Amino acid sequence: MKRVSKRVASLLLAGSLALLSASCSKDNTSSANSTNEYGHINLSALRTQVNSLPNEPLSPAETNGLLLMREEEKLARDVYTTLYQKWGSQVFSNIAGSEQTHTDAVLMLLTKYNIADPVADNPVGVFSNPVLQNLYHQLVAEGNISVLHAYKVGATIEDLDIFDLANAMTVADNQDIDLVYSMLSKGSRNHLSSFYRNILNAGGSYTPQYLTQAEFDAIINSPMETGF
């Protein structure tokens, strides 16, 4: 799974994000406590913050990043929803609910900038991006093997999500995009820690596939994040 997933990640990044630009320094926008342990975003509070920030011109890389993250967050939600139905493990239900708020947060930005939504009315397991469509089927098949495999799928998704968000933030300088991506990253770090605990409790182990070992260790050894 690791080799295939790395190839998929490369296709996603090469096809959807122009991530060769140098990293930009960022000014974090402070906020009230808007995310809990499972990363459920307070969308009302976030909308107020997003709407208070200026509409700035979007680069093609920023637009492509928003389109990708809208569906990548849906991918996480859909896989977790499906694996919860298979195994009944509450962590999948809890984090699927969080991922709904994550994909809704990206939709907030698409709406603000009048970008057509790639999700529209697509049901669970249906994606506009063919790479994500294939990845959904791959991850569900892997997660259906056993509950331990399912937890590892969850960790892999969050590993990839944190990696992609970090790369997307290097080419996004709009304040509202930076705010939303920061919130998504915070939630994804909590999710990764949750899945890792479940992997250990099931007698398994996990080696990061996209993050460095040092980045992964820093996440799993830190307290759960609960707000800015």
Locations of regions flagged by a protein language model:
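Bacterial Sec-dependent N-terminal signal peptides
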Residues: 3-52
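All-alpha RGS (Regulator of G-protein Signaling) helical domain and cognate RGS-like helical scaffolds
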Residues: 32-228
